[in-house]
C-alpha cells in the first residue's frame, strides 16, 4: 500500500478513536519531500571538503561530547573546517545574521571573502578531525544564523520585501531569494541552509515557524538546480516529536505536535541549544546531508562556476 495513504488511514483511525472516547488528540503534520527517485543516505565514498559558517551555537553543535557534529561528519567522510567570530577578510566571521548573508553570497558579496571561504582548511572550533585534507576547495558550504534571528517582526505570511534588510519576515525572504542568484552561478558547490534555532520567548515564535516552513517547503520550488538544500535545525529543537529527517525511506518534516519555542534551551535565559537538542540535530542532519550530497552529484554539477 502507498506509504502516504497508509499514513493517512492511520491518522484517521487514531482520530476516530479519540472522538469515540472523548480524547483531545494532537496529530503531527508530516511533510514529505518530493522525490525524483531513490534517496541515498550513505556517506560519500571519498572524503569531501566541507566548511561551516557559525557562531557559538554551531561551536557547541560541532564539539565532542556536546552535539558531536564535527566528529560525526568526519566519520561520514567529510573533512570539516569552520569559521567563527573574527574569521576572514574584514572580520566577516562576526557577521552571520540573516541580514548579513548578502555580504557573503548576495549582491554585496566580495571575491576576497569567497576565495578565503572556499580555501579555508583550519578548525576554528574544537572537535575531532581525523581525516586528511583531500585537497581542492571546500565543496559543501553550511551556513547558519543564531537564535536572535528567530525574532522576526511582521506577520507570518508576509511576502518578500522588494528592498532593504531588517529583522522582519519580509526582509528575511528577500535575503534568501537574492542568494539564489549567486548560488545558480556556483553549481560546483553545495550550499546548505541551517535554519536559526528557536527562542524560548514566544512573542515572535509564529513568525519564526512560518518563515522556516517557507524555507523548507516553498523557497526552492522554482529553483532548477540541486546545489541548494535546507535543514530545519529550528524545527528539531521545538519538540522531541518534531523532526527533519530521513525516515522509512522518505525525507519527513514533522511539525504540529508541540509548539514553536525552544524545548532544548541550555537554561532559563540562555537559548543556546543544550547537548540533548544538539545531538538530536546531529542524528537527523547527517543522513540528510548525505542525501543532499548524492542528489547534487547525481545532477552532474559542473567543475567550474557557471557564467
Predicted regions and their residues:
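Loop/turn elements at helix/coil->beta-strand transitions in domains of secreted/extracellular proteins
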Residues: 45-49, 76-81, 136-141, 185-192, ...
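Conserved SGNH/GDSL esterase-like catalytic core that processes O-acyl groups on lipids
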Residues: 58-60, 64-166
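Substrate-gating cap/lid alpha-helix
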Residues: 196-241, 278
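Histidine-centered active-site loop/cap adjacent to the catalytic His
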Residues: 252-302
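N-terminal Sec-pathway targeting helices
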Residues: 2-15
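A solvent-exposed, charged loop/short amphipathic helix patch at secondary-structure junctions
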Residues: 152-171, 255-267
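Active-site-proximal beta-strand/loop segments in catalytic clefts of secreted hydrolases
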Residues: 53-56, 83-88, 143-148, 194-199, ...
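N-terminal module-boundary/linker segments of secreted carbohydrate-active enzymes
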Residues: 31-81, 97, 290-302
Amino acid at each position: 500500500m502507498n506509504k502516504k495513504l497508509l499514513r493517512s488511514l492511520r491518522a484517521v483511525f487514531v482520530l476516530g478513536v479519540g472522538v469515540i472516547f472523548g480524547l483531545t488528540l494532537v496529530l503531527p503534520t508530516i511533510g514529505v519531500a518530493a522525490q525524483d527517485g531513490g534517496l541515498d543516505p550513505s556517506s560519500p565514498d571519498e572524503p569531501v571538503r566541507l566548511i561551516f559558517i557559525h557562531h557559538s551555537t554551531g561551536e557547541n553543535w560541532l564539539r565532542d561530547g556536546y552535539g558531536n557534529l564535527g566528529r560525526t561528519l568526519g566519520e561520514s567522510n567529510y573533512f570539516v573546517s569552520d569559521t567563527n567570530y573574527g574569521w576572514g577578510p574584514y572580520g566577516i566571521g562576526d557577521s552571520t545574521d540573516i541580514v548579513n548573508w548578502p555580504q557573503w553570497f548576495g549582491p554585496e558579496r566580495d571575491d576576497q571573502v569567497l576565495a578565503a571561504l572556499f580555501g579555508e582548511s583550519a578548525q576554528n572550533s574544537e572537535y575531532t578531525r581525523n581525516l586528511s585534507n583531500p585537497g581542492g576547495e571546500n565543496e559543501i558550504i553550511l551556513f547558519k544564523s543564531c537564535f536572535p534571528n528567530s525574532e522576526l517582526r511582521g506577520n507570518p505570511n508576509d511576502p518578500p520585501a522588494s528592498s532593504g534588510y531588517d529583522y522582519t519576515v519580509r526582509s528575511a525572504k528577500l535575503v534568501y531569494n537574492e542568494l539564489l542568484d549567486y548560488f545558480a552561478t556556483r553549481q560546483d558547490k553545495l550550499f546548505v541552509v541551517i535554519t536559526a534555532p528557536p527562542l524560548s520567548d514566544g512573542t515572535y515564535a509564529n513568525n519564526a515557524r512560518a518563515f522556516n516552513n517557507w524555507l523548507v517547503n516553498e523557497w526552492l520550488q522554482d529553483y532548477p538546480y540541486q546545489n541548494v538544500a535546507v535543514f530545519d535545525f529550528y524545527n528539531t529543537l521545538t519538540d522531541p516529536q518534531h523532526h527533519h529527517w530521513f525516515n522509512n525511506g522518505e525525507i519527513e518534516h514533522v511539525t504540529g505536535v508541540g509548539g514553536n519555542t525552544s524545548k532544548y534551551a541550555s537554561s532559563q535565559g540562555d537559548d543556546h541549544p543544550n547537548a540533548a537538542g544538539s545531538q538530536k540535530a546531529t542524528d537527523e542532519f547527517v543522513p540528510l546531508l548525505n542525501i543532499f550530497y548524492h542528489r547534487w552529484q547525481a545532477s552532474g554539477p559542473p567543475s567550474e562556476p557557471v557564467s
